[in-house]
């Protein structure tokens, strides 16, 4: 190993603590979160991403539906572990069965998902799950993992002098960052159940929602196979649903 290569790597690693915004215990999860962005930084990132999402996907042009989903979301947000944040809930004009959050505190639901749900309680369970991602700070943690994965790729390339190693590390980084991961999804499920119950809705609705997703997933896999493409599955390759 080239000893001179160690110096920039050590400098790279030494800079990491300077970027950490906090590792305090999260009241929603009872765990310590190591993240590289403060809540204010996350809000700014989410605002910027919202403009891109609206441009790329478009909002459903039915204000009554938008208002209804926002009102339901606010009910759940008020009983979450972060009730003082400014939440916004949007319906995306997309036929796919999906819902997602980019962080504090925007939640997006596809119109295609809404038409497949059968009750208000099922909609609440979806919104509660996404709010669970926010209160557990999963988006911020995923962003931090992405930064660390990129730094790891740079370090591997410097230490070995091999671009091939860096490329392999990048493949690992992509798999690591994509999706929230099974543990995070289960954590969001647990928080979503808790918030649904606090808001006065039957927690059993989440199980029915899972069944809707599973049926939609089977249909999407069959259609994708016929169309010769990859299926578009809710929450990515590491989904627990």
Task: List the predicted regions and their residue ranges.
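A Zn2+-metalloprotease active-site environment signal
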Residues: 7-8, 15-16, 23-241
């Amino acid at each position: 190993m080239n000893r001179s290569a160690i110096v920039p790597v050590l400098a790279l690693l030494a800079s990491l603590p300077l970027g950490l915004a906090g590792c305090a215990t999260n009241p929603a999860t009872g765990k310590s979160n190591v993240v590289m962005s403060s809540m204010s930084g996350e809000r700014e990132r989410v605002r910027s991403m919202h403009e891109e999402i609206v441009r790329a996907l478009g909002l459903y042009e039915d204000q009554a539906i938008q208002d209804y989903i926002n009102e339901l979301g606010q009910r759940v947000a008020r009983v979450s572990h972060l009730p003082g944040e400014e939440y916004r809930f949007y319906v995306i004009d997309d036929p796919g069965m999906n819902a997602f959050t980019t962080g504090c505190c925007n939640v997006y639901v596809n119109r295609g998902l809404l038409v497949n749900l059968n009750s208000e309680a099922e909609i609440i369970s979806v919104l509660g799950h996404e709010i669970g991602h926010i209160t557990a700070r999963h988006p911020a943690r995923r962003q931090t993992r992405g930064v660390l994965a990129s730094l790891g790729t740079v370090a591997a390339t410097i230490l070995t002098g091999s671009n091939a190693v860096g490329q392999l590390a990048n493949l690992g980084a992509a798999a690591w960052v994509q999706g929230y991961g099974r543990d995070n999804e289960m954590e969001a499920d647990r928080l979503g159940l808790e918030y649904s119950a606090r808001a006065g809705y039957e927690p059993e609705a989440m199980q029915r929602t899972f069944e809707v997703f599973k049926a939609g997933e089977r249909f999407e896999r069959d259609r994708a196979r016929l169309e010769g493409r990859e299926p578009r599955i809710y929450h990515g390759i590491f989904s627990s649903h």
